Amino acid sequence: MVLKDLCDRIVAAKCSSKSSTEIVDNTQVPASSKAGSSDSKFPKASLWSTFFTSGFSVDETYSESSSSEKKTVHSRNSGWAAAVRKVVSGGSMRRFQERVLGSCRTDVSSSDGDIWLLGVCHKISQHESTGDVDIRNVFAAFEQDFFSRILITYRKGFDAIEDSKYTSDVNWGCMLRSSQMLVAQALLFHKLGRSWRKTVDKPVDKEYIDILQLFGDSEAAAFSIHNLLQAGKGYGLAVGSWVGPYAMCRTWEVLARNQREKNEQGEQLLPMAIYVVSGDEDGERGGAPVVCIEDACKRCLEFSRGLVPWTPLLLLVPLVLGLDKVNLRYIPLLQSTFKFPQSLGILGGKPGASTYIIGVQNDKAFYLDPHEVKPVVNITGDTQEPNTSSYHCNISRHMPLDSIDPSLAIGFYCRDKDDFDDFCSRATKLAEESNGAPLFTVAQSRSLPMQVTSNSVSGDDTRFEEDDSLSMNLVNDAGNEDDWQFL
């Protein structure tokens, strides 16, 4: 009973986060203070790794404490830790462990409906199940799917960015990290397929390691935070400053083009065209943004340098769906986008804190949180079994979907022309069901009228500010709550 109470207290402590901003390092780390720094608050991302590990030790939670602090904690607990280790290895304790970790990591119920995770449905509804075994299997499948998504968080200890003293992106880099996660999933789907899962009992896939290397924290890594900031200068990106979804999408467009020109004769590091769907080039406003089929074809032709008419395509749709909150009429539409097989989720989150939303269950939005601070790691292909644990999360977090910030961007990955045609068909149907207020529409060309129209819109771009509130500098010329910003 004492052990159970202790476990419950530890689990409750690990699962008590009430917001997406679990910032455990509130300092910016200049290059001059890189050496000798120590943080006493550095929780692991996974409850599994901090409590129920084979080498059980309480001081693992304080991995960056000073050596003297570690010795004190370890000596105080080594006696009962050895005893508990024996209990943990037992079958009854293992079942208890699974029950505790399952509730903490998923916090979902079969009564809440099915979960849609990046185009895949995990059918956990009670009426879909024939027994406890089926429920456990479905939950396990969901957990494995969630765990296999690539997590990219704040890092500290990397080389200073350009001429600045910043060796960490703590408190300002959450949108950049969220966007890295979305692009990483696109690469994962492209190279390994949507059904790929990360396993602990098999050798890691080379393609998977290649993807992680692209997102390292140095100028040598193609899609690093260093190179994103360089590519996004024209859209206001700067070291230590916050950025909005629209500028982030355009930055990826620039970075991909720069990388393509740099590797003109070699293999493309981002083997897909990028199409940012955000209104006319001359700035004309009005209605929902339009996925123009001719523009998509043009992007593919440019990417292949005219060699083939179609290539894999990454679509990014930045939107502002309200003023201080998302207009509720858009919530069902956002939910439906996760049912698209092409779904890459949403760049967004609570006001002031960008996250990467990858799934929904009714009114819940499951997300990966970039706000945990982790030390820089160097993933190389030379290591036989590289440690990639910091790129995955065993704890699934969720927030109410109607609480997300109205400034967001939706991503889709289309593998080929048939996949794009399927996306267009689904998007058109979704627009037809929107009661006149679609997220976006589809048209063959810019000269054709939009299939579905919505109210006039106006506004300025907004940026994520990583505090408790989001400063929204929106101008609502029409004075209508349903109006949203056309980017």
Curated annotation (Swiss-Prot):
* Entry keyword annotation includes Ribonucleoprotein: no
Chain's gene name? ATG4
Stated family: Belongs to the peptidase C54 family.
Which molecular function GO terms apply here?
A: cysteine-type peptidase activity; protein-phosphatidylethanolamide deconjugating activity
Its function, per the record, reads:
Cysteine protease that plays a key role in autophagy by mediating both proteolytic activation and delipidation of ATG8 family proteins. The protease activity is required for proteolytic activation of ATG8 family proteins: cleaves the C-terminal amino acid of ATG8 proteins to reveal a C-terminal glycine. Exposure of the glycine at the C-terminus is essential for ATG8 proteins conjugation to phosphatidylethanolamine (PE) and insertion to membranes, which is necessary for autophagy. In addition to the protease activity, also mediates delipidation of PE-conjugated ATG8 proteins.
Q: Which UniProt keywords apply?
A: Autophagy, Cytoplasm, Hydrolase, Protease, Protein transport, Thiol protease, Transport, Ubl conjugation pathway
Which proteins does it associate with, and in what oligomeric form? Interacts with ATG8.
Its top-level enzyme class, in one word, is hydrolase
Q: What is this protein called?
A: Cysteine protease ATG4
> What's a single GO BP term from this record?
autophagy
Catalytic activity of the protein: [protein]-C-terminal L-amino acid-glycyl-phosphatidylethanolamide + H2O = [protein]-C-terminal L-amino acid-glycine + a 1,2-diacyl-sn-glycero-3-phosphoethanolamine
Record's subcellular location: Cytoplasm
User: Per the UniProt record, which EC number(s) apply here?
Assistant: 3.4.22.-
Q: Which residues form the active site?
A: 174 (nucleophile), 369, 371
Stored InterPro entries: Papain-like_cys_pep_sf, Peptidase_C54, Peptidase_C54_cat
Please provide, in alphabetical order, the Gene Ontology terms of the cellular component aspect for this entry: cytoplasm
